[in-house]
């Protein structure tokens, strides 16, 4: 560990310890206050949350290792398997199984299935050959080739990791960038087109980028638990609004790049190294069929064929493993760190939900007095700002559990803007729109490393696209609300919300093993002041997960 990282570690640790010993009673959390007294488990969750947030922002350790630390700390200090000195009389500890279950959360399986598809596509050059075929219609005019590169990058990013997509497309682009004259600023437009396409394209599908999956998991789980009166959002529904949103942003980004970096080159020929005829080997054909099958199943939705989106993601896992398409070596090279990072966020959500801390925190802020517009705009801007300086996944992991609880508490006020669904989707999009600096996203860093981009141009492009993207997402959510895309709000939405905000969970909240399986990163609000966190058996949890 370097000296700088050690200093960051010490600062974050000290602040987390301070959070554990703050005089919360003097801050309003006392018996006489409607907010009530924080129990020891709630205070420990605050300490872990502060530590995780600072570690994710300052990064004294890899961000995925912070998630692992979160899970371990929760198990040994808050669970029914914690060390004896941490047991609290009169307070039911969180089930250790519910914390561990975050590693096998259905959203984790959805992402893992996406990793299998991406690895197989790369291994059998499906990505390169698709790029060759799809770029052909854009001709040799540099302006249209630029648009083509952006759109193709966006399409790949919908099903592959943003980083892998950017790395692949920059490799394709590398020989072309060398063809530009020294004084032709157009080369910067091409270099920036790749991270823009990767960052924006990932918003088109639930598996395109982790913030989407985190928001979708939080939303659908809240609906399954009955905390939210809305319809679950399927893979196909997400694409129905996500893909048009991506296309509009891509066109805007294309025009913006040409304005900032005029292209002088008159003709351009792309020779994609490694691409050729499509592989017709048996394993390659298995990849093609499985890829098309999964996409079709996701797009058509559970209502047509009956298979849950998360279950569909397991099809390529089984098929590719049994046929040898994916080997042990391929498995070892997958981005397990991303899955562990997301699992840590889900574990925080379990802690917030199970201890009743979310309800306490909500009562400290008069969200009910906020206008729905102020709530949505404020959350979006905060999320966008944070996403420019820290991991997009970390940003969503920190904010989604809290904002889900806030949205549930104020769901009657949000109906005109699309409800809690609109709030969480716009927050997920805001997390992906933070791309104004080289450190904002891995695709930005890769593009900056080519030497063809400058920080100023990246900042201008990133800020403009971030703000335009936010405004467009709000407008889209309002439009979808007016056409009842997410379903007609039920009366219970207005009835359940006040009860949920009325009182925090009691200190003796009962938490069961499977609560987290159904809760993930979401934060459930109790129904009344005498309510306890409902005891859910494993069968009920499986049913809740299937309800997604």
Regions found by a protein language model. Give the residues of each.
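Structural signature of hydrophobic alpha-helical transmembrane segments
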Residues: 35-46, 104-113, 162-166, 245-247, ...
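Flexible hinge motifs at transmembrane-helix junctions and intramembrane kinks/re-entrant loops
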Residues: 36-39, 51-69, 75, 99, ...
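Transmembrane alpha-helix interface/packing and boundary motifs in multi-pass membrane proteins
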Residues: 54-61, 152-161, 195-207, 297-301, ...
């Amino acid at each position: 560990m370097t000296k700088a990282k050690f200093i960051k570690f010490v600062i974050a640790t000290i602040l987390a310890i301070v959070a554990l010993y703050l005089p919360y009673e003097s801050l309003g959390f006392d018996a006489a206050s409607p907010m009530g007294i924080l129990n020891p488990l709630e205070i420990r969750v605050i300490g872990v949350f502060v530590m995780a947030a600072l570690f994710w922002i300052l990064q004294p350790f890899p961000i995925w290792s912070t998630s692992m630390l979160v899970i371990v700390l929760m198990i040994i200090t808050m669970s029914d398997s914690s060390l004896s000195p941490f047991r609290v009389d009169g307070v039911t500890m969180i089930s250790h199984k519910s914390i561990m279950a975050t590693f096998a959360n259905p959203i984790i399986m959805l992402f893992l299935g996406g990793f299998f598809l991406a690895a197989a596509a790369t291994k059998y050059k499906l990505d390169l050959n698709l790029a060759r075929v799809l770029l052909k219609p854009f001709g040799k005019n540099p302006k249209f080739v630029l648009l083509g590169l952006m759109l193709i990058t966006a399409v790949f990013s919908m099903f592959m990791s943003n980083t892998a997509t950017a790395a692949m497309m920059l490799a394709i682009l590398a020989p072309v960038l060398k063809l530009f004259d020294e004084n032709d600023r157009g080369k910067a437009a091409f270099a920036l087109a790749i991270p823009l396409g990767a960052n924006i394209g990932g918003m088109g599908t639930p598996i395109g980028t982790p913030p989407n999956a985190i928001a979708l998991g939080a939303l659908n789980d809240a609906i399954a638990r009955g905390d939210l009166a809305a319809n679950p959002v399927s893979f196909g529904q997400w694409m129905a609004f996500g893909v048009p949103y991506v296309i509009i942003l891509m066109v805007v980004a294309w025009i913006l790049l040409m304005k900032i970096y005029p292209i002088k080159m008159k003709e351009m020929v792309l020779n994609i190294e490694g691409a050729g005829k499509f592989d017709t080997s048996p394993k390659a054909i298995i990849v093609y069929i499985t890829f098309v099958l999964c996409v079709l199943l996701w797009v058509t939705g559970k209502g047509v064929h009956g298979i849950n989106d998360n279950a569909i993601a397991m099809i390529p896992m089984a098929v590719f493993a049994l046929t040898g398409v994916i080997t042990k070596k391929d498995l070892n090279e997958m981005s397990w760190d991303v899955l562990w990072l997301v699992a840590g966020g889900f574990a925080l959500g379990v802690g917030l939900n199970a201890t009743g801390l979310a309800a306490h925190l909500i009562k400290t802020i008069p969200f009910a007095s906020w206008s729905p517009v102020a709530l949505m705009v404020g959350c979006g801007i905060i999320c966008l700002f944070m996403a420019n300086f820290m991991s997009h996944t970390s940003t969503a992991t920190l904010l989604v559990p809290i904002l889900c609880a806030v949205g549930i508490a104020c769901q009657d006020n949000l109906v005109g803007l699309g409800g809690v669904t609109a709030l969480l989707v716009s927050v997920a999009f805001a997390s992906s729109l933070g791309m104004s600096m080289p450190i904002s996203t891995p695709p930005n860093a890769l593009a900056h490393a080519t030497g063809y981009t400058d920080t100023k141009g990246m900042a201008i492009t990133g800020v403009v696209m971030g703000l335009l993207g936010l405004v467009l997402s709000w407008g889209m959510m309002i439009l979808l609300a007016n056409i009842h895309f997410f379903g007609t709000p039920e009366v219970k939405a207005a009835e359940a919300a006040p009860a949920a905000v009325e009182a925090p969970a009691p200190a003796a909240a009962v938490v069961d093993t499977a609560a987290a399986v159904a809760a993930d990163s979401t934060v459930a609000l109790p129904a009344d002041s005498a309510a306890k966190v409902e005891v859910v058996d494993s069968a009920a949890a499986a049913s809740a997960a299937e309800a997604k």
